[in-house]
């Protein structure tokens, strides 16, 4: 059994296979996932798992050089936005419109669907390098 905190086998495999600049999205329960993009559906019920919990676990495994979020998160979900800033720390954040973020998910290696019911809780993480 793995010793690290991420134990979802498919998600672990996807992260391990990501190269520099590849992207992966973490989505709330309502974000449309484009056809042809892998869906890793973790949603069990309303707010399980939460968006921020899922982000913390993924950040424990993935080297991230940039995070992309929708500008709408700041206004529509300010508490989540404030916590997100703390979690991301020094990772640069790019803000785009929600519509642009949805288009950008077409290029992601996968979209991780959570049970999150808070609006605009979506993020795209761009893989960095550890050296």
Swiss-Prot record:
Molecular functions (GO terms):
D-ribose pyranase activity; intramolecular lyase activity; monosaccharide binding
Q: What is its EC number?
A: 5.4.99.62
Q: Which cysteines are joined by disulfide bonds?
A: none
Task: Give the matching InterPro entries.
Answer: D-ribose_pyranase, RbsD-like_sf, RbsD_FucU
Which Gene3D superfamilies would you find in this protein's record?
RbsD-like domain
Whether Isomerase counts among this entry's keywords is: yes
Uppermost EC category: isomerase
Catalytic site residues?
A: 20
Protein name stated in the entry: D-ribose pyranase
Identify the coding gene. Answer: rbsD
